[in-house]
Amino acid sequence: MNREELNLQFEKIYSRLNPEQKTAVDTIYGPVLVIAGPGTGKTQILSARIGKILLETDYMPDNILCLTYTDAGRVAMRKRLQEMIGADAYRVNIHTFHSFCNQVIQENISYFEKNSLDPVSDLERIDFIKQIIDHFKKDNPLKRYRGDVYYEVGRLTSLFSSMKKEGWTSTYIKDKVEEYCNDLPNREEYIAKRKTTTKGITFQKGDLRTDKINEEIKKISILNYAADAFDEYQTIMHKHNRYDFDDMINWVIQVFENNEPLLQDYQEKYQFLLVDEFQDTSGTQNMLVNLLCKEIDSPNVFVVGDDDQSIYRFQGANVENIEAYKNKYENQLVDVVLKSNYRSTQKILDLSRSIIENNTERLSAKYPDIKKELIASHDIRLSSVASPELHIYENTFQELVGVTNQIETLLQKGITPEKIAVIYKENKWGDELIKFFKEKQIPFYSKRKENLFHIPLSKKMITILRYIAAEHSISYSADDLLFEILHFDIYKIPSFEIAKASVAVNDAKYEKKTSLRTYFQEWIHTA
């Protein structure tokens, strides 16, 4: 696409922007913070800004680096940019943080000396953590001797990932645990509200509930044992020449910090930095952004985020990044708040604002200049007179039935299925709803494919495998799983017989090797 064609395409898109969006696009130089609420067209301004840079400066597409949080965001931005600037969209560097770090590593193998490493598989990661659990001392609270002895694999995996994403060390976590424990006596929930006697100890109203504090300290202190295992995990990974995606960001940060010329090469190459979904960046991702702007008086860094939409906090994301960015460039920063919403009706926006305003950690509560009152701006949405309704159910089952019945009623009124949408917080609720829809023969489409491991037969197979693994580790240790397995319809064992077996085992007071397994072995041989 030549410059004239680019200009025509850009003007076509630019003419549709509202004043706030135009301000964000027009501010090419210096640090910019765009607070983009839901449905305010942030992807459009990111692509329009890139078009503006290419039109009004002498820089090339490969002088622009755009970092997104997810692959979906990267694909959406590339597609929107291609519509505007054509084939040059593929010359603009649009990366997730991980793909950018991988590119840096591949371009500078000699700095990293990681050419002999391979990415760790999920199975390998689980095996490494099992090795760590096997090496735990007997008094380690994370070590189990009955049931699923590797129960903590999932939680340790999550912790180690968070430590890498945030750049935390085991010492840092221990310090935070100590800080948390020391603060417990200052918390209102540990002050007795009335006279209480528990375990022979009487607490008067206003007394410090030392029993609850000790219980909380005992629970949180387990984190110290888990953090201690992190270094061993890293040692095992190195021993087996393995790495994971979180390692890549830390490697690049370390090399940039220790090799100023290399960092400066990338700073020179990328004259414009754009960061999408900034509220969801982790500690290490934010460190990477700061390094790319290091010692530049007024960096051309453009970040888009919304403190009300931080959805990846459990993955290490930290909404405080927006606040830190605002404070860092306070005297140079251009703030832009997108207020025009093109997705929802005003009544929905007003309801959501009345809820989110209770959050005292919002930017608008800390910075009076940031006003986040979204205004419905789509022509179709402006004509809507429907009001949100709140339905309260006693339990989850009743809620699922209620939603299904409402949809069935709408279909009976002639509303077509494609005009009905269900939004849920967690995927598991979608799985449950699908069961009800199938029962009522309600046609549906889900973007989320059915998980093989959630199919009833798969669940049964997994339970059987868990039982075998537990028995292989410690014999006669998984009667609870066996009790569940015996009820599977594939075995056609009468429930009465299973109950008799449980009673017989209980009457035997669990003498040596007396278990459901032993009982049924004898029952089968004598039947």
Predicted segments with their positions:
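Conserved motor-region signature of P-loop NTPase helicases/translocases
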Residues: 1-79, 91, 219, 268, ...
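Amphipathic, charged-and-aliphatic alpha-helical interface segments
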Residues: 251, 256, 501-509
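A general alpha-helix detector
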Residues: 128, 132, 159, 229-233, ...
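Short coil/turn segments at secondary-structure boundaries
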Residues: 143-147, 170-178, 239-250, 265-267, ...
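Surface-exposed helix-capping loop/turn segments at secondary-structure junctions
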Residues: 134-146, 238-242, 261, 362-365, ...
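Conserved P-loop NTPase-based nucleic-acid remodeling module centered on helicase motor cores
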Residues: 63-175, 320-323
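Short, intrinsically disordered, charge-balanced linker/junction segments flanking boundaries
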Residues: 523-527
